[in-house]
Amino acid sequence: MTWVRNHPVVVLWIAIAVITAARLASLVLTPLNLGPDEAQYWSWSLDLSAGYFSKPPMIAWLIAGSTAMCGTEEYCIRLFSPIIHAVTGFIIFLAARRLYDERVGFWAALTYWLIPGTSFSSLLITTDVPMLLFWSLALWAIAEMQSSRSWRWPILLGIGIGLGLLSKYAMLYF
């Protein structure tokens, strides 16, 4: 138990790998048809654009990338969802570690990965998935800006907000 306490980042990487692998396996093994929104996003991915009637383009770009890699099966369309949630949790760890400490970062990331909303969202591809990634990226940049005068953090903040806006317009509330 002492080793686990002394190496939270290693434990976190193991948790990321196990949780993400389980979610990817669940995508492949669960015969869940696309929901109406997911089907609409998939149809957008067939004709990429800079934006659509009701949503920005990021979701279509992600689906186009995943289907180019593995095909048009439902699990391929949703492929990036559990992967993005894994990255989002790790960025939450980085932000919480900067604001508090490594232990708080560990529990913040683990809580994010295990809450029912994230678990369910990992099985779907929606505009919330990439927006949460870029929202957490912007949060991490702000946390780093509190203690660093480096120019890279404001740039990362702008990138996070910009990509978040390309994911979901609700990023404006950030």
Over which residues does each language-model region extend?
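Start-transfer (signal-anchor) and selected internal transmembrane alpha helices
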Residues: 1-23
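Short helix- or helix-capping micro-motifs
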Residues: 16-19, 108-116, 161, 165
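Short acidic/glycine- and proline-prone juxtamembrane loop motifs at membrane-interface regions
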Residues: 117-131
